[in-house]
């Protein structure tokens, strides 16, 4: 709820249509059919239609933001972006316990990283372990933006003289592989991340949306909004916060 009692904002997040995503059209805008893929998305879609109903039938100032994935260092740890950056921070702290020049990194049958420092004084050796990063579908495409940009869009919707519904997105789609590339680059890791990641089927979603790429032309034209944060800067900020 924003402003006076007649101003309502509802953020629908991603429920835009899977039937469109699986066809050659590789973008989604306000005209794309909705196709919610989870109970959460179904509930958000109901709220979206409620906002439209109260606006069109009762003249209330209600807006819905159709928000594509928006991230920041405050993102919950169960979401894949923050899961990756938090794991990187923990991995760096683990690795720094021993001079990285002295360790041999391998993995055992349980997909656990193992460091073996060079021979210490005497016959003793120290062994320590750290779990690999377990992820699902690395080829899923997402349109990731910075939460600061999206909150600015919400505020601008509520300041406009006419209520409406808008897609809020970046217009760029990146895979989880690309997120990993940027995240490990941001931590200055000098090896490939492929040996540090395990593909775990339990992290595959039963109703996966393969491709998301939002078109924000409408909100740019009506409100002069566009994203300020680049994908690379967003990832770097999240990694830096977790280091």
Positions of PLM-derived features:
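C-terminal substrate-binding subdomain of Rossmann-fold SDR/epimerase-dehydratase oxidoreductases
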Residues: 18, 23, 29, 75-243
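Catalytic helix-loop patch of NAD(P)-dependent Rossmann-fold dehydrogenases
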Residues: 1-66, 71-77
């Amino acid at each position: 709820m924003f402003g006076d009692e007649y101003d309502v904002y509802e953020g629908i997040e991603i429920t835009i249509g899977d039937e469109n995503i699986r066809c050659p059209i590789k973008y989604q805008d306000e005209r794309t059919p909705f196709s919610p893929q989870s109970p959460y998305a179904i509930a958000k879609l109901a709220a979206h239609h409620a906002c439209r109903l109260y606006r069109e039938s009762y003249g209330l100032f209600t807006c819905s933001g159709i928000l594509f994935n928006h991230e920041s260092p405050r993102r919950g740890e169960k979401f894949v972006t923050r899961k990756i950056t938090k794991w990187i921070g923990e991995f760096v702290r683990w690795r720094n316990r021993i001079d990285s020049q002295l360790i041999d990194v391998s993995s055992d049958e349980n997909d656990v990283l193992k460091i073996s420092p060079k021979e210490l004084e005497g016959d003793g050796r120290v062994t320590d372990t750290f779990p690999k990063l377990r992820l699902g579908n690395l080829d899923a495409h997402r349109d990731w933006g910075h939460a600061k940009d999206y909150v600015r869009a919400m505020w601008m919707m509520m300041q406009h003289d006419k209520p409406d519904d808008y897609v809020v997105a970046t217009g760029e789609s990146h895979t989880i592989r690309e997120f990993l590339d940027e995240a490990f680059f941001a931590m200055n890791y000098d090896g490939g991340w492929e040996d540090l990641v395990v593909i775990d089927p339990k992290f595959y979603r039963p109703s996966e949306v393969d491709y998301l790429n939002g078109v924000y032309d409408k909100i740019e034209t009506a409100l002069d909004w566009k994203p300020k944060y680049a994908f690379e800067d967003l990832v770097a900020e999240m990694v830096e916060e977790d280091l």
